[in-house]
Structures are given as C-alpha cells and as structure tokens.
Amino acid sequence: METGLKGKRVLVTGGSGGIGSACARAFAAEGAQVMVHFHQGRDRAEALAAELGGSTRIVGADLTQEAEVERMFAESGALDVCAAVAGAWPAEDLPVWELPLERWRATLDANLTATFLTARGFLRQLEGDGSLILVGSTAGIVGEAGHADYAAAKSAILGGLLLSLKNEIVRKSPLARVNAVAPGWTESPMTRGHVSEEQVRRVSRTMALRKVAQPQDVAAQVVVLASPVLSGHVTGQVVSVAGGMEGRVVHDT
C-alpha cells in the first residue's frame, strides 16, 4: 500500500533503542531518508545505519539539553517527519512516598522535557506539510503504580502537549499534523530483564490479545500516522498499541 513517504526526510529520536530502531527500519522500508538519533547507543546506531544503507545518517544528542537539541536540528537540515520516540522507564518500582525528587525530575526530563524540546525543534524548522508523532505509554492513560513519575510524564505528552501542538502546528503549515501512539507492554531493551514472566501473565489479564507487543507493532502505527496518504485527515489522536488493554490489575486477589 502506498504511504507517500518515499523520499521524505525523517528523524527518529531514540533510534538506537527497540521501538526507535523498528521505526527507523519501517520508514526506510517505505523509501524515506532516515536520520537515526542516539544518546549513548552510538554503536547500535552505526550498525543500524549500515544495515539500512542508502541515505541513512546518525546524530547524537542528549535530548534533555537545549543546546544539544538545537545542534541536532541544525545537523539534520530540513525535515518532513519527526518520530519522537526517545524516553526512559526507570526500572525500580517505588511508591510515591519513597520516590526521591531527583528521580522524579530525571524521569520528567528524559520523557516530557525531551519530547518538548524535540517537538519545538521540529516545528521551528518546519516548512510545508509535516507530521510529528509523539510516543506516550498506556501508563499515561491508566497510570502505573510504582512509576508515578513515568506515568505523569507520559500523560502530559498524550494530553495537554499533544492537543496544544495539533492546534499550534497549523499556524506554521495548514495541513501539518501531530499524533501520538501509546504502547502498552512492549518487548524492548529498556524493559528486557526487568519484567518477569509472572508479571507478564498478571498484566496480560487486562488485555484482549493477552500478549506483549513487539517493537514493529508500534512502528507500524507510527508509519501509518506519519503517512499523508493513510492519515492525511488525522491529527490530535492517540493510537493505543496495547492488545486491547482495559486497565491495570490493582489487587492480586
């Protein structure tokens, strides 16, 4: 199916991670010119660029640092699409009464501030009809006990930030769009080793499909939302990629 993404200039932040690399591969498969962002995963980004070949480039930046984000967009040049995938899930399970302010701030920086700076940089350089895709989480919809910091950041992305951006972007370009995906439990390097089989069985009770997503499941929806052909009249929307999740298991019995 034609997506209209051939030749489009695409930036994928967090491109060396699980969902990010899947997005980069999916855009490259559609003939897009992909720039893969990384922070600490240079080796993975270089390997991915070599795998994709063609016009694929890489760029390193700490997305919580304003100057580095500005440099990233200066290096990227004109862009048509930005997939703001980069984020961080803190592995340690902490209720709010044990949550240090330092972790709270670090989690909001890595997720919400990084997404804000990425969105701002993309909109500043936008010319013509572009597409911005934010990546939230089901934690931002139904919460996540033990990770209130992460849930708060993702909720802000999927709520106030998304809905504000979709109305602001059209001031730059009348047909430009902003949408978001909300992955549920997804197999990725960020979660691998931190989630037990028992935890997966427990949370899958809330899912119609009762399985963990793969990064390519999320990437497929990112491509659909980026496509001016498939989603040209879609903006301000959140697509849940969570196997029909309806909430959280609050009590074991």
Q: What is the role of each PLM region?
A:
Residues A119, A153-K154:
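Active-site helix of classical SDR
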Residues S16-G17:
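Conserved glycine-rich cofactor-binding loop
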Residues S137:
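Residue(s) in the substrate-gating loop at a strand-loop-helix junction
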Residues M207-V218:
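A conserved structural motif in NAD(P)-dependent oxidoreductases
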Residues K172, R177, H233-T235:
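Short, small/polar-rich loop/turn modules that mediate ligand/substrate recognition or access, typified
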Residues V229-L230, T235-T253:
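Short C-terminal tail/terminal secondary-structure segment
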Residues E92-V96, P100-R105, V203:
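Substrate-binding pocket helix/loop in short-chain dehydrogenase/reductase
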